[in-house]
Amino acid sequence: AGAPDFAGRMIGAGPQPGDRWNGDPRMADDIKEVLGGMGAEVVPFESRHFGQSYPYGNKIEGLATLPAGEPFIFFDTDTIVTGDIANMPIDFSRPAASMKREGTWPEEELYWPGYTAIWKSLYDKFGLDFESSLDLSQPDEYWERYLYFNAGWFLGADPGAFHAKF
């Protein structure tokens, strides 16, 4: 209703119960009904890597539910869209993310290893290239230097390729 010129699809992806969750993470039925009433498709996905231990990682896993090879925008459930998204000038060939990341980073402690060690350990755990993820325009150990996936939104040309990479 708020985006009459939008020709895309709205897909709500939700994790399903499994051994990576202590409880039931599914979307409430009334929420699914509201989304459906607005034309959204609600699709389930299995949490294979993250689940309850790192809920923010589930947004990466949810990308596997989206149509491969089609441009996508991911919005967190708490993202407020205030205009018609059909009128946004978007270049899907260049992956992008919101930059509202402050206030969610680890607090420095007396003997902590530092941002580089923390983030590199995560990339190493999943066999990803850490060096290519760094924003070298930012100083070493400054929080904005490190790619972060708790963005309110992110977009790209292919959700399958994005999911496979991360």
Regions found by a protein language model. Give the residues of each.
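Glycosyltransferase catalytic domains, chiefly GT-A lineage
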Residues: A1-F166
